[in-house]
Swiss-Prot record:
Any single Pfam family the record assigns to this protein: DUF440
HAMAP family in the record: Put_dsDNA_mimic
Entry similarity comment: Belongs to the putative dsDNA mimic protein family.
Cited function: May act as a double-stranded DNA (dsDNA) mimic. Probably regulates the activity of a dsDNA-binding protein.
Naturally occurring in which organism (per UniProt): Vibrio vulnificus (strain YJ016)
The protein, known as: Putative double-stranded DNA mimic protein VV1228
Length: 106
């Protein structure tokens, strides 16, 4: 197995993918909200990989080789990322590129 990319690089890659795909996968109002408030409240953060990913991607997720990144807006009152626009599972193996996104749905 190749050396895994760092968690910081995984977050950066996830954010780049999110920006590219968000206009086609989010409601226009959510894209406007995210864009307008990202500087003050936006976040892309690494979280523990949820156990439900196997059901979404069809394989058991190796928690060392993958990262889960959540992208959204932080609640200013409690500093919690509670308005999640995308949950992303991204491979940290540069030879096995993979990304799966669960988009916010109203």
């Amino acid at each position: 197995m190749a050396d895994l990319i760092s968690y910081d690089d995984a977050i950066d890659a996830a954010y780049d993918i999110f920006l590219e795909m968000a206009p086609d996968n989010l409601e226009p109002v959510d894209v406007i909200l995210f864009t307008a408030q990202f500087d003050d409240r936006g976040a892309a953060e690494l979280v523990d990989i949820s156990d439900d990913w196997a059901g979404h991607v069809g394989f058991d997720v190796d928690k060392e080789s993958y990262a889960e990144v959540r992208i959204g807006l932080v609640n200013e009152e409690n500093d919690v990322l509670d308005d999640v626009f995308a949950r992303m599972l991204i491979s940290r193996d540069p030879d096995q590129k993979f990304c799966h996104i669960l988009w916010k749905r109203d």
